Amino acid sequence: SRGLGDVYKRQALFFDPAADTFTLRQWFLDRPTEEKEMLVSFFTFLSDVKRLVHFNGTTFDLPYLTHKALFYQMEDPLSSIASLDLYQALRPFQSILGLSSMKQKNVEQYLSFPRKDQLNGKQLILVYHDYLQTLDEKKLELLFLHNYEDVLGMGSVLELLALPALFHGDFSVQSCRFTGQALEVSLQPEREVPVFLSRVCADGSLTAFGSRVSLSLQTHTAEL
């Protein structure tokens, strides 16, 4: 995230093979004059990363970090790292999910992810600058809480990748029968669908949850 031009915080959740556990690491800019040093540390960390998973980083975060690398005449590690943008991957399924917005907090709420942080990015910039003036530990806690829950929340959002996998054909057909008016198909997805989905349209219906997906396609007869 940034505050009036400065990258003031970065965070990453990564698997540590040595410890056999996931570790959350945060970088925080408590002195704006040390922005370059923080970026050097963050980019050094990325040098061993094979893939980035983020939420809507394609639109802002990644281009902004690339801009900062150019500004400080640093090597940009992002260009050589594979990237998965959860927002871009899930946005086509907004209507199926029945969501009015695909903001991360909206998706998390849909998935019943428990979140304490209630601040948005613009509010956090003000909190950050207040912290620089006051060094109030409570404001610092708010900043770290937001980052912490942003990263953990993506863990729950990841489960929704079952939807693009399903629509890309990652399933096996369990049964298929014709009732005379509709074609009833039962599918088993490769990834379990984490939420109950039920959608109906003029040409059929779809229900999905867990390891079961049911598809009903209405048939039409006509004379040539």
Where are these predicted regions, by residue range?
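Two-metal-ion RNase H-like nuclease active-site motif
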Residues: 1-2, 147
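Short, small-residue-biased leader/transition segments that mark boundaries at the very start
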Residues: 3-8
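Basic, amphipathic juxtamembrane/active-site segments
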Residues: 9-14
